[in-house]
Amino acid sequence: MTRILWKMIKDDLLLPYIDLKTEYYDLGLEHRNETDDQVTIDAAMATKKYGVAVKCATITPNAARMTEYDLKEMWKSPNGTIRAILDGTVFRAPIVVKGIEPCVKNWKKPITIARHAYGDVYKNTEMKVPGPGKVELVYTAEDGTQTKELVFDFKGPGVAQGMHNLDNSIESFARSCFNYALDTKQDLWFATKDTISKKYDHTFKDIFQEIFDADYKEKFEEAGITY
């Protein structure tokens, strides 16, 4: 369906008015399976090269899709793969035009949601715990020394998940958010569960604050917006 819609958009709205030169990458599930998902990586690298892309909706397979499409494996989300390569930020901005009325009538200004697009659940490692036993986080330094943290001492079957992120990616995320707020003249609100996640989420909070204080505080004051 997305192929049909994109073709209609190009044929009716774009090609009659502009000389559109594009590279096309088929991210349909069957073709991703045929190429061992290499086509998704190729599409991401092309996006990085040209600085712009239009991506249509894709299927991220679950167990039922594995059987339906006879897949080699349960391929990861194309969005997650592309975002990780681009180290990008997802901005969900509302459509604000006459004729489209907001659900909350007294909201006159747009609310944009910014989400970090690297790591977290998109690059996680999961396992099903078959029975009693310990799940641990282990960090092995280059010199071979190890640091261990107990995740949970299971008394029966369950599930476990490990996630990661990078300081430089969080810094890039912070700058994207601050620059977007300045460009659109929107106040920026930061939300995380740092009171519970005192290392993972708190690192996001600390990095945002450090960058804001060092590089953006005066710019925000001049623009009349707040963080």
Language-model-detected regions and their locations in the chain:
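N-terminal alpha-helical transmembrane segments of multi-pass membrane transport
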Residues: 1, 6, 10-35, 44-47
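Glycine-rich phosphate/diphosphate-binding loop of Rossmann-like nucleotide-binding domains
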Residues: 1-8, 12-15, 137-227
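Generic detector of short, locally flexible boundary/turn motifs and exposed helical patches
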Residues: 19-21, 75-80, 153-157
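Generic structural hydrophobic/aromatic packing signal, biased to beta-strands
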Residues: 22, 54, 82, 111-114, ...
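Short, ordered loop/turn segments at secondary-structure junctions
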Residues: 27, 58-59, 193-195
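Alpha-helix initiation/capping motif
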Residues: 28, 35-37, 166, 222
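N-terminal glycine-rich phosphate/adenylate-binding segment common to multiple enzyme folds
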Residues: 31-142, 146
